[in-house]
Amino acid sequence: MTSMTTFTKVVLFTDADGYARFREESIPLAQGTPQSMLSYVFASGGYQLRTSPVGFRSQFHCTGAPQWCFILGGQMEIGLQGGVSRVFKPGEHFYSADVLPQGTTFDPAVHGHWSRQVGTDLLITLFVRD
């Protein structure tokens, strides 16, 4: 087995047309040793734990401030306008950065994403703010 030299960051972002989309970015793991590859140290503005019950589903909304979301338990589905969705399982993450463009009024038919708990297990997430 070889070492990973990059970490794939899944990003939920607001595109130029106002719609939320997913993209992937690579973060170099250029520090540390071959046995323990590290990224640079990221600044953070705190963290928050959340649990969501079986059956939870939000309405369309935008992220208030960019933050990482790590799935600790259960499964979380993120849905976008147009029917695209993605399910995240324990150990997976996404970087939520689909903020409302400055000067724009929120339109639930255009902006944001919805989230929901999937399956029979409680959803447990960790949010880490920039």
Regions found by a protein language model. Name each.
Residues 82-100:
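Short acidic-glycine-tyrosine-enriched beta hairpin
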Residues 16-60, 66, 121-125:
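A short glycine-rich, His/Asp/Glu-containing loop-to-beta-strand
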Residues 64-82, 92:
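Glycine- and acidic-residue-biased ligand/ion/polar-headgroup-sensing regions
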Residues 2-14, 83:
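Short acidic, Pro/Gly- and aromatic-enriched capping/linker segments at domain boundaries
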Residues 53-56, 74, 80, 100, ...:
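Short acidic (Asp/Glu) patches
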